[in-house]
Amino acid sequence: MLAFNFKKFLQSGQYSDVEFSIKPEMFPISKMFKAHRQLLALRNEVFAAMFYGPLPEKDVVVITDLHPDGFYGLLKYLYTGKPKIKSTEEAMYTRTAADKYLEPYLALTCSEYISAHVTAEQVCHVIDYTLLTGGEYVDNAVGRLLEDRPEAILASDAFTDCLQETVHFVLEKVTNVPEMYVVLAVHRWAQAFCQKIATTGNKPVDIKTAIAPFLAKLRFLALTPEEFVTFNTSDDTRDVLCKDDAFAIMSVILCNKSIELPSWACKERKPRCSDTKMSGC
């Protein structure tokens, strides 16, 4: 711990002798921070090597792999000796910076904050960020919420706007939720994806193409006949499955016979509310 709090010098930039230009490639945001070489070098071995090693950095250091809020969270910790996290987003970004600059206590504190504060509405943001940054694991709290608050997660704006890889992750982990709820949530994601593509000027994508990557993870056989008929006849969803595929699935739901299913179809009939793992897909 520091005997003196140097945060005021971080905030004011007084006596600074180096600048950090944070320009992350994956975020549309950039920021400059003024800092002090000797203080950073005394507090952190990575900065010591950076500023006083064989190839010292110049007066402006450009960083492209960290969010500005995360780098500032690291600086606050080094200047004050105390981790101070105020939001789940800040905890995610700061943990990445802590890992990069070898500050395990700060990284642990960030993980503990996420576990204690992440909400169902934030789950997909956490998964998105973890996948984007190549994280090796998703926080345990996310897994718990996928079991305890599945409907809130699937109904969240974060799910509708998340990465395709995050949708796959959720479909592999989510439990304790009616399958029809899952199917409709994925359909909403696909609709939003089509709308986003339309605003980029790229070639339009139809709903059938957008939802296709996830069909193999949807348990259509776990739906009731009424639910499946509703899905295939409603104005919004009736064009998702071709007639032959829909007929084959409906035949299995009704007759429970060994009728040949489409090659992509998930063969799991068990509802997600009755188990904790997908199997047979």
Map each language-model feature to its residues:
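N-terminal BTB/POZ boundary and linker segment
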Residues: 1-37, 41, 76-88
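Eukaryote-biased feature marking scaffold/signaling PDZ-domain proteins and nuclear chromatin regulators
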Residues: 10-15, 28-30, 34-35, 42, ...
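Eukaryotic cytosolic interaction/assembly regions at protein N-termini and domain boundaries
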Residues: 14-16, 148-281
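Ordered, helix-dominated protein-protein interaction surfaces in large eukaryotic regulatory proteins
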Residues: 22, 37, 41-42, 49, ...
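Cytochrome P450 catalytic domain signature, combining two hallmark sequence patches
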Residues: 45-60
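Short, charge-rich binding segments
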Residues: 53, 63-66, 84-86
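Eukaryotic helix-linker segments that join adjacent hydrophobic helices
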Residues: 63-76
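Post-BTB helical module
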Residues: 73, 79-168, 172, 199
